[in-house]
Amino acid sequence: MARLKEIYWKEIAPKLKEELKLSNVMEVPRVTKITLNMGLGEAVGDKKVIEHAVADLEKITGQKVVVTYARKSIAGFKVREGWPIGVKVTLRRERMYEFLDRLLSISLPRVRDFRGLNAKSFDGRGNYSMGVKEQIIFPEIDYDKIDALRGLDITLTTTAKNDDEGRALLRAFKFPFRN
């Protein structure tokens, strides 16, 4: 079992049950999935960009990546319908907890000038989104082998009913919020 999953069920869930005054341990909010997305606008001019992004995201997550395609043509962005414009991957269960563990203990401390995560990045339903400016904060990425610095979006989907429950859950996981 993943280290964070064990910590969640043995320590975090009982503590949150009391804190949120819930009657059943199954009502306690939990993380259901983590979605990583790389929007690649520069892929319009160079098709190799998608290949490099797929390789990077597969190294980071250890899972097969899905290429996303443009739904409709937008002349202003020089994008045609059906062109590849991004990559994404959804992590659940064990891999999700392992990724979350690596993100909190290894990757976030490697961010330059890191002052904490914005505590206001919740969506109103207890889900949290954050952006990473460079993929090199992940230990799986070798700095010498990358072609360009790319950012990615990380979204944590939870079963929390509102932002306060979601915030309590992520604080229990020791998320480094700045405010």
Curated annotation (Swiss-Prot):
Keywords carried by this UniProt record: Ribonucleoprotein, Ribosomal protein, RNA-binding, rRNA-binding, tRNA-binding
Annotated PROSITE patterns: RIBOSOMAL_L5
Subunit structure: Part of the 50S ribosomal subunit; part of the 5S rRNA/L5/L18/L25 subcomplex. Contacts the 5S rRNA and the P site tRNA. Forms a bridge to the 30S subunit in the 70S ribosome.
InterPro entries given in the database record: Ribosomal_uL5 (IPR002132), Ribosomal_uL5_bac-type (IPR020930), Ribosomal_uL5_C (IPR031309), Ribosomal_uL5_CS (IPR020929), Ribosomal_uL5_dom_sf (IPR022803), Ribosomal_uL5_N (IPR031310)
One example of a Gene Ontology biological process annotation: translation
HAMAP family in alphabetical order: Ribosomal_uL5_B
One Gene Ontology CC term in the entry: ribonucleoprotein complex
Pfam families: Ribosomal_L5 (PF00281), Ribosomal_L5_C (PF00673)
Name of protein: Large ribosomal subunit protein uL5
Source taxon at top rank: Bacteria
NCBIfam families (UniProt xref): PRK00010.1 (NF000585)
MF terms in GO: rRNA binding; structural constituent of ribosome; tRNA binding
Species annotation: Pseudomonas fluorescens (strain SBW25)
Gene responsible for this protein: rplE
Reported function: This is one of the proteins that bind and probably mediate the attachment of the 5S RNA into the large ribosomal subunit, where it forms part of the central protuberance. In the 70S ribosome it contacts protein S13 of the 30S subunit (bridge B1b), connecting the 2 subunits; this bridge is implicated in subunit movement. Contacts the P site tRNA; the 5S rRNA and some of its associated proteins might help stabilize positioning of ribosome-bound tRNAs.
Family, as annotated: Belongs to the universal ribosomal protein uL5 family.
